């Protein structure tokens, strides 16, 4: 072993490296866990730099502790992630230190912290469409309007990674 680093819930199911090989994105496949972003540019000094959890919390009674990430894939500046009963999320990872969910589609009418629902989301078609497979509902073909998050939607510094002094340019 050259190096190791624990993930947020210590139950990593998958990992995907960024196109520049500097960042690793992981999913911990347990209820209430996260997609993690890690700086692996120096494998002897791995750093956790951000965690994100599917925000809709459409698990049982809307509880965040019921969301379970399954697999994430890097597609350019985005992470496309299957989330069991919460469907598919698209995360802007152009800044791996500040992961922002920009889109989601719930494939499953089911709820709760179980392993039903969306098992996979494949973003690599030449058309840009995403294929999502749901164990109970079947195949979904999703059009995803990829677009960068500009930091304009969050205004509560206590609720998000928001810098009130930051400037954005169009």
Question: What are the roles of these predicted feature ranges?
Answer:
Residues 1-151:
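Feature marking well-ordered beta-strand scaffolds used for ligand recognition
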Residues 134-136, 145-170:
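Primarily marks secretory-pathway-exposed extracellular/lumenal segments that are disulfide-
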């Amino acid at each position: 072993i050259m190096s190791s680093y624990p993930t947020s819930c210590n139950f990593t199911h998958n990992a995907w490296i960024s196109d520049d090989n500097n960042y690793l994105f992981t999913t911990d496949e347990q209820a209430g866990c996260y997609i993690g972003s890690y700086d692996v540019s120096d494998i002897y000094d791995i750093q956790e730099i951000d965690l994100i959890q599917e925000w809709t919390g459409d698990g049982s009674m809307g509880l965040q502790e019921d969301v379970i990430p399954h697999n994430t894939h890097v597609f350019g500046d985005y992470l496309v992630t299957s989330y069991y009963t919460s469907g598919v999320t698209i995360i802007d990872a152009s800044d791996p230190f500040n992961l922002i969910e920009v889109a989601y589609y719930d494939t499953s009418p089911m709820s709760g912290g179980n392993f039903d629902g969306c098992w996979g989301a494949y973003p690599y078609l030449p058309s840009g469409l995403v294929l999502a497979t749901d164990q109970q509902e079947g195949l979904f073909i999703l059009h995803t309007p990829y677009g960068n998050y500009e930091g304009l939607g969050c205004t509560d510094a206590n609720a998000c990674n928001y810098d009130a002094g930051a400037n954005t340019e169009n």
